[in-house]
Swiss-Prot record:
Protein name from the UniProt record: Triosephosphate isomerase
Keyword Lipid metabolism: no
InterPro entries, per database record: Aldolase_TIM, TIM_sf, TrioseP_Isoase_bac/euk, Triosephosphate_isomerase, Triosephosphate_isomerase_AS
The keyword Acyltransferase belongs to this UniProt entry's keyword annotation: no
Positions of substrate binding: 9-11, 166, 206
Gene: tpiA
Gene Ontology annotations for the cellular component aspect, listed alphabetically: cytosol
Keywords: Cytoplasm, Gluconeogenesis, Glycolysis, Isomerase
Organism whose genome encodes this protein: Mycoplasma genitalium (strain ATCC 33530 / DSM 19775 / NCTC 10195 / G37) (Mycoplasmoides genitalium)
Lineage: Bacteria, Bacillati, Mycoplasmatota, Mycoplasmoidales, Mycoplasmoidaceae
Pfam family for this entry, one: TIM
Similarity field: Belongs to the triosephosphate isomerase family.
Active site: 93 (electrophile), 160 (proton acceptor)
UniProt-annotated location(s): Cytoplasm
Amino acid sequence: MRTRYLIGNWKTNKNLKDAVSFVEQFQQNKLNYNAKIGIAPVYVHLTEIKKIISDSLLLFAQDANFIESGSYTGTVSFTQLQDIGVNNSIIGHSERRKYYNETSAVINQKLFACLKASMQVVLCIGEALGQEISFLKTDLTNCLDTIDKSLIKNLVIAYEPLWAIGTGKTATPEVANQTIKTIREYINDLYDENVANNISILYGGSVDHNNIQKLAIMEQIDGFLVGKASLEIKNFLEMARVYA
C-alpha cells in the first residue's frame, strides 16, 4: 500500500510566534492518523520548530540547494538542512520555477543531491493552462535524468496544475485522478511497473477543507500538498480529520 500524505506548504507566511502556536495546537490534538502529516515553514523558523515538533508531524524545507557549501548568497544547502535535523524538502515548486527561473536541469541536481543523501523529497510538477499533459512526461524525464531507481524510494511527486495554484480553482476529482494515473504511466516508462505502482503521488492546487473529501476518494491520489488552506490551524485540522 502506498504511503499517504497531507503536507502544508506555508510559503512566505507566518511569523515565528504564529508558526510555533500552530505546531503546539496541532500536537495537542491526540488523534492517530493513517497518513503522514507535514508542514513546510520558511527557512528561518525551521530550527525553532524542530525543537518542539513531535513525531506526529514531518518537518519540510521549501527548497534545498544541491551545493554543499560555497559562495552562493541567499541559498541553504541540503547538508545544512540535515545538520539541523531537517530531512525532508519540497523541490521544484512552480513558484521557484516562475520567480527564480529554476530549470529542470537545476531541479535534477537538487533531486540527485537530496535523494543521494537519503532525504525525502516532494517533487512538484504541473502544466500551465493550455499546455498538453504530455508536457509532464518531458518535465519528469528531465527532472529525473540520472536519478537511479535505487534512489526513488525517498521520492514523492506532487501534481499541481499551475492554473489551480492560489486561484481558488481546482481540478475536478476525476481529472486529477486521471492525470495522476497518466503520471504513473510515465513513471512506468522511465523506471518500471513496481516503481510506478508504489510511488506516492499527491494533488495540489486550491485544496481546502471543503473539497478534500471528494478528491480523497479517488484511487490514484495519495495525498495533498496544500498551500493557503494550511495556514489556519482549524482548517488544517479539519483536513487531517477528513483525510488522514
